[in-house]
């Protein structure tokens, strides 16, 4: 009975890891035709955020430059000018399609994220017993590791999250979050988060090491500081 209970959290953990990805993929595939049809037929207003508006304006500026070029080369043969106008028309249609596709992807990503969050919340509420067993299993696994491996793992994790090269990773993650939810990418806000969030994490880590690890395993703290130096 104990062995069976110990194995129960493993399928639970696998479902937590793979279920959101599977739902995201199936949800996008099944809902994309419906969202595309709804956006193209029922959408009466065009609402852009600052980034999308900037991209659209840049695209139309390029088209305007092509029109000016068209005016400058009117002495060219009519067939050449006609081909140029057809090309500009195709580029305009492509620009509108890209704009619509961006909105469709934002709607799909936002809906998928909300669905995955709801499923994970239901898992955490309904699977309380599995979470307790999983927590005890993780604690037992960490307890059996040597202090050197623990210190090395903590050092590796902290370097990845708050190390010298971490701001680039934080910029990518925050930018991806903004893009998935369709928010306006404010460079000042992103820069502020990148400069302050790692500092907050570093402070929390030092507090945890001082108040928890120093009490539970002083040798681990000594090894950690030795590796860090």
Swiss-Prot record:
Entry GO MF terms: antiporter activity; proton transmembrane transporter activity
Catalytic function, reaction form: K(+)(in) + H(+)(out) = K(+)(out) + H(+)(in)
Cellular localization per UniProt: Plastid, Chloroplast inner membrane
Keyword tags: Antiport, Chloroplast, Hydrogen ion transport, Ion transport, Membrane, Plastid, Plastid inner membrane, Potassium, Potassium transport, Transmembrane, Transmembrane helix, Transport
Gene Ontology CC terms, in alphabetical order: chloroplast inner membrane
Domain of life: Eukaryota
Any single Pfam family the record assigns to this protein: CemA
Membrane topology type: Multi-pass membrane protein
Any one Gene Ontology BP term: potassium ion transport
Membrane-spanning ranges: 7-27, 106-126, 189-209
Chief site of localization: plastid
Function recorded in the entry: Contributes to K(+)/H(+) antiport activity by supporting proton efflux to control proton extrusion and homeostasis in chloroplasts in a light-dependent manner to modulate photosynthesis. Prevents excessive induction of non-photochemical quenching (NPQ) under continuous-light conditions. Indirectly promotes efficient inorganic carbon uptake into chloroplasts.
Family: Belongs to the CemA family.
Name the UniProt record assigns to this protein: Potassium/proton antiporter CemA
Organism: Nymphaea alba (White water-lily)
């Amino acid at each position: 009975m104990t062995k069976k209970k110990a194995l129960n959290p493993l399928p639970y953990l696998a479902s937590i890891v793979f279920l959101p990805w599977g739902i995201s993929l199936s949800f996008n595939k099944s809902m994309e035709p419906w969202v595309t049809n709804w956006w193209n037929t029922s959408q009466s207003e065009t609402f852009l955020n600052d980034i999308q508006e900037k991209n659209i304006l840049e695209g139309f500026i390029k088209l305007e430059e092509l029109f000016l070029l068209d005016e400058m080369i009117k002495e060219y043969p009519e067939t050449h000018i006609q081909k140029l106008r057809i090309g500009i028309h195709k580029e305009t249609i492509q620009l509108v399609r890209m704009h619509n596709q961006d909105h469709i992807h934002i709607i799909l990503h936002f809906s998928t994220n909300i669905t995955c969050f709801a499923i994970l919340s239901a898992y955490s509420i309904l699977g309380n017993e599995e979470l307790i067993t999983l927590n005890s299993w993780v604690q037992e696994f960490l307890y059996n590791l040597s202090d050197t491996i623990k210190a090395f793992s903590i050092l590796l994790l902290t370097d990845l999250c708050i190390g010298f090269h971490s701001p680039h990773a934080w910029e990518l993650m925050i930018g991806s979050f903004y893009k998935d939810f369709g928010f306006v990418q404010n460079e000042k806000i992103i820069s502020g988060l990148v400069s302050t969030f790692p500092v907050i994490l570093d402070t929390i880590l030092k507090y945890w090491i001082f108040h928890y690890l120093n009490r539970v395993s002083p040798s681990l703290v000594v090894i950690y500081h030795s590796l860090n130096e």
